[in-house]
Each structure stands twice: as C-alpha cells, then as structure tokens.
Amino acid sequence: MKKHFLSYISVLLLALLLGCEKDTGTSGSSPVCFYLSPEPSTRATDTEFEKGDAIGVFAAARDDESVPAQLRPSGNFADNKKYIFDGEKFVPDGESNSIFITSYPIDYYAYYPYATVDNPLEFTFHVAADQESLTESDLMYARNTDGSGKNNIPLTF
C-alpha cells in the first residue's frame, strides 16, 4: 500500500514540475504607457500633442542597476515600438508594439514624429519639403532613465 501511495505522489509531483513554465511577465499584465510630464517651457505656439500623434520608443535593459542603459544598433529590449497619443497618454499601436514591465531595470528612449528606424544610433531626420504641417518637421526626443518598473512612465519632450 505504501509503495502505491509513494508511486502516486511521485507521479503527481513529476506532473506538477513538468507543467511549470518560465513566466515572461506579459501574461495578464498591462503594457507600459507613457505620459507627458511636465509640459515643456517654450514660447512656441502649437506645442501640444494631438490625439493620433505617434512616437517611436526604444527600451534598453540595464547591465548594471546603477548605470543607465545604452542603446544598441539592434536587439534592445524593445526596438522602435509605435505608441499613439490618445489625448491623455501614449498607448501601444496594437499588441505587437506593446512593451511590458519586467523585474529588471529598463530605460526608455522616445522620439517624435514616428518613423521607420532600423538603427537608433544612425537616426536620420529630414525636414518636410511641404511645411503645411510644421509639427511633422519638429524632431523631439525624450528619455526616462530611472529604471522604473512601473506601467506609467513619464516623458519630457
């Protein structure tokens, strides 16, 4: 009887161990969003983001918790994820652009306006020939290097 009981317990424990998988941190968690904080001090007009404006976001994991991360040409924690302004904050443009928090420090680098960028270290920006929409020619960037593991990350452009 004891043999059967021990065999049963062993099989049950083995099944439990085989059923475990590594947690990636994305299951059931909300993606990171970005909000503007504080508003920049400027004399320029038309300086607010409008609903639908898009930014590109790169995220880099820190090797050393006390030193901000450096972007690499590719293979960062997140490479050029597109985030859209919803009137209050920047949210991912679809699930494939979502960035999820992790247990290790992440630094965020953002730019406006969104463009296709393969290598953040060789970013080329061209001023629009048609100046009808001046904001499309306003290159701005922001970064957050506090290594926060929060869902709402402040950015100052």
Language-model region placement:
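Short, low-hydrophobicity acidic/polar segments
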Residues: 26-157
